[in-house]
Amino acid sequence: MNLVVALTGATGVHVTRILIEKAPWPVTLVASEQGRAVYEQECGAFAALEARAAEVYADSDLKAPIASGSVPTRGMVILPCTVNTLGKIAHGIGDTLITRAAHCHLKEQRKLILCIRETPWSLINLQSAGNVAAAGGIIMPLSPPFYMMAGRDPASVTMEDLLNAYVDRVLSLLGQEPVENWGTVR
């Protein structure tokens, strides 16, 4: 079964690349138009990311297999997830492949992880996150698990270290055993 990875138009798309590289499952990739634009601005050619995926669909392709709940998946991660996408999912709007696939994951009770990058949150964002969590989704703000750097000189910790630790937490929510956890680093 494939892991569905979607990216929307928030910054922080380096984490998307790391997730796809580290995922032990084949990846089905979907990007919003703005997600593609941000990726190209921050990381370079989007085609390089597409080459790492087993399948790639346009966000406008509502006939893609993942638009149906009958197609099994490992789960879905929206990384990064804009608060606009969060709001659409929270209120039942499935007008794109990303939001439709998210709704399929909720209704089929499959893992749906929304990695919200934007801060601070308004009351509307908090309520939307609550709605998605109540429906079975996992809200995981793009905040690295700093505790995984315990005992290290902060000057020696790189952005890549923090992003890798974050991705390991995401993958652990999908059933992948983490290389390190709090018990091994403390």
What do these predicted ranges mean?
Residues 1-113, 117-186:
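A cross-family phosphate/adenosyl-ligand binding-site feature
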